[in-house]
């Protein structure tokens, strides 16, 4: 085999790849079908590793408080089984500059976008019309 085939010259061992570490995402979405599709899409198209999920505001805030450094991307739906995504935004106010918070909602009106951005979101995308923009946001360096 040769270097182009992915082996170290003369050793027969696979060469180490120098891929950037996968972005670690935590998902706050109560609809299992949407959540599963989102996780699959983020993994396949954006190289994102999902580290967990919550279906409620309280569950999300608890996990975020217990794992403050275990994520780089937080994806939040606004309407949850209990509580709201706006409450989750408040719960992650003490995050590092490298951590990004994205609201992904079916209700991304101008007013909702303003409220989410004022509440701490870095970006807001509509689930039904802005998935390409969402994925592009997730893959570009910040």
Where would I find each of the regions flagged by the language model?
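Non-catalytic signal-transmission and effector/linker regions of two-component phosphorelay proteins
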Residues: 1-26, 32, 132-142
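Two-component/phosphorelay signaling modules centered on CheY-like receiver
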Residues: 32-52
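Acidic, metal-coordinating helix/loop segments flanking the phosphotransfer/catalytic sites
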Residues: 53-73
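Acidic catalytic/metal-coordinating carboxylates
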Residues: 56, 84-87
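Active-site residues of response regulator receiver
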Residues: 77-79
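Short amphipathic alpha-helix used as the core "switch/output" element in two-component signaling
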Residues: 86-97
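Alpha4 helix (beta4-alpha4-beta5 surface) of REC/receiver domains from two-component response regulators
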Residues: 87, 108-125, 129
């Amino acid at each position: 085999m040769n270097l182009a085939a992915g082996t170290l010259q003369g050793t027969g061992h696979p060469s180490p790849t120098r891929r950037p570490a996968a972005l670690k995402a935590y998902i706050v979405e109560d609809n299992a079908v949407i959540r599963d599709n989102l996780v699959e899409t983020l993994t396949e198209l954006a190289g994102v590793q999902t580290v967990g999920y919550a279906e409620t505001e309280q569950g999300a805030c608890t996990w975020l408080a217990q794992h403050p450094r275990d994520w780089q991307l937080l994806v939040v739906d606004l309407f949850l089984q209990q509580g709201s995504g706006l409450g989750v935004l408040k719960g992650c106010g003490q995050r590092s500059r490298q951590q990004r918070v994205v609201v992904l909602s079916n209700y991304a009106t101008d007013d909702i976008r303003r409220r989410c951005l004022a509440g701490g979101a870095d970006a807001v995308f509509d689930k039904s019309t802005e998935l390409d923009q969402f994925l592009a946001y997730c893959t570009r360096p910040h």
